[in-house]
Amino acid sequence: MRGTPYYYNGDELGMTNPGFTKITDYRDMPTLNVYKHLIATGGDIKQFMKRIQFSCRDNSRTPFQWNSSANGGFTTGTPWIGVNPNYKTINEAAEDKDPNSVLNYFRKLVQLRKENLTL
C-alpha cells in the first residue's frame, strides 16, 4: 500500500521558525493566554519566550516567502502576522534557481514517487 507523503506550507523551501522575540509578534490565542497567566502569577517569562520560539503554532503560520521583495512577495499590504526575517535568502524565487535547493530536492522526490508505483 502506498503511503501519503505530506508537507505544510513552506516545508518545500525549508522555511524555518521565525524566532519572534516579542509577545506582540504572536497571534496564537492559547500562547497569548498562557503569557497573560504567567504575567499574573509571576511566571518565568524569559523561559516562556524561548520555548514558544519552538513550540508555538504561529511558527507555521508566517506568510509564504515567494521572493526577496517586501513581505517576501506575499502581499503588498500588511500581513496578519510578521514575515520570517530570513525571507531575503529563503524564498521560492531564489530556490527555484538553485539546483541544489530544498525546493528542487522536493521536486525530485515528487517526480520519483510519480514514476515508482511502489513508493
What are these regions (language model features)?
Residues 1-119:
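Loop/helix patches that line or flank the sugar-binding groove of alpha-linked glycan CAZymes
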